[in-house]
């Protein structure tokens, strides 16, 4: 793939905003509520980060998956603003990309309203022209539907786009949509885990994107 990158699509959790503690505590509360006889460590919960909630809960407890999803969302929203954190340098890098007229979008496995809440808490909401949540697509990442929808709304092509994320779902979705891909080294599962899915780039910090998009011009 050659040519100018004009469009950058991002995952939200673990990429733009640090919701790791929020997610882990929410999973712990949900699992304690529905599976009190089982013990889940933080390490046990890490694989749950990335897939959609229903995908995870159907594997754990298919008979109560929907109830678990509802409980999770209620707990998550209640504690959201207290546990969400910013990643150093993300706001500034996104601001520069926005000011340089790059097209910016989000493709997440979270619901649209929860995405917007996280963006507003961190002040990032003003930079993104398109936000695609789980409730706007029929197929979650790694299916390319969300990326393709975002590109269409941004009037952009796959040849000029890059998908950035912290999980294999993000990298695989980008590959399935035939965009460039970038992993983030601050992923909770670690850069080594993400590297095995062979993203085109690995970001040590969000500002690394500036060099990548400028080099592609």
Curated annotation (Swiss-Prot):
One function term, GO molecular function aspect: magnesium ion binding
Name under which the protein is recorded: Pyrophosphatase PpaX
Organism for this UniProt entry: Listeria welshimeri serovar 6b (strain ATCC 35897 / DSM 20650 / CCUG 15529 / CIP 8149 / NCTC 11857 / SLCC 5334 / V8)
Keyword Magnesium carried by entry: yes
Reaction catalyzed: diphosphate + H2O = 2 phosphate + H(+)
Xref: InterPro entries: HAD-like_hydrolase_sf, HAD-like_sf, HAD-SF_hydro_IA, HAD_2, HAD_sf, PGP-like_dom2, Pyrophosphatase_Ppax
This protein's GO CC annotations: cytosol
Protein family (similarity comment): Belongs to the HAD-like hydrolase superfamily. PpaX family.
Coiled-coil ranges (or none): none
């Amino acid at each position: 793939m050659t040519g100018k990158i004009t469009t950058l699509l991002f995952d939200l959790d673990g990429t733009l905003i640090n919701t790791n503690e929020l997610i882990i505590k929410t999973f712990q509360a949900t699992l304690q509520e529905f599976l009190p006889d089982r013990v889940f460590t933080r390490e046990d919960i890490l694989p749950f980060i990335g897939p959609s909630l229903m995908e995870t809960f159907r594997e754990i407890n298919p008979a109560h998956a929907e109830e678990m999803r509802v409980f999770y969302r209620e707990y998550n929203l209640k504690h959201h603003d207290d546990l969400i954190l910013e990643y150093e340098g993300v706001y500034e890098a996104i601001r520069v990309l926005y000011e340089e007229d790059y097209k910016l979008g989000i493709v997440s496995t979270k619901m649209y309203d929860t995405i917007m809440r996280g963006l507003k808490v961190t002040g990032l909401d003003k930079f993104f022209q398109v936000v695609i949540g789980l409730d706007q697509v029929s197929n979650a990442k790694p299916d390319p539907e969300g990326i393709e929808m975002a590109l269409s709304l941004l009037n952009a092509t796959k040849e000029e786009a890059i998908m950035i994320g912290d999980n294999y779902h993000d990298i695989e979705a980008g590959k399935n949509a035939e965009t460039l891909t970038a992993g983030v080294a601050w992923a909770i599962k670690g850069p080594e885990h993400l590297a095995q899915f062979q993203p085109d780039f690995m970001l040590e910090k969000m500002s690394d994107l500036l060099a990548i998009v400028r080099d592609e011009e």
